[in-house]
Amino acid sequence: KGLPFDREWAIAHEAAKLAPGWNPCMNFTRGAKAPALMAVTASLDEATRRVTLAHPVAGEITVAPDEPDEQTRLLTWADPLIPPGRARPAAVVRGGVAMTDSDFPSVSVLSLASLAALSKQMGTDLSIHRWRANLWLEGASPWAEWDWIGQRFRLGDAVLEVVERITRCTATTVDPETGMVQGNTLA
């Protein structure tokens, strides 16, 4: 299963075609289509299930995403972060399991050595937050993770199996400090 509270809520846009269970990311507002969203930071108070979101332009909001009145406040706060011409935020959705890009519970594992190699190649320090990974590993050679498919490793009591590579999208081209496109990480 995924990590607790990882991508537990998402904002569906007005053109979403949601079905019970897992839904593809194209149904939700996301950084690939709305770069300003990449500058949103989040913190969760597990006891109250309240989430605080902060953005350098939109400011800060604290909401309980499961409460209908709070959902309206959240949608109103998020709307200015969506570019003109894009489907507007319409509903807060709770997935029950992590709403990742795969239709099975998953955890994304990336390598700090690969990040350092890409940063060097691009001539800039790239933030780990561009990739929204669950786990960052150190000690491997750059790009070694590409050969990990089929491998298993232990993390505490959990055993993780690498089943596929992550296909990256344009969200990684956005500076998470500013929400502005900066650098072609996909080249």
Identify the residue ranges that each predicted region occupies.
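Metal-cofactor-dependent catalytic cores
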Residues: 1-187
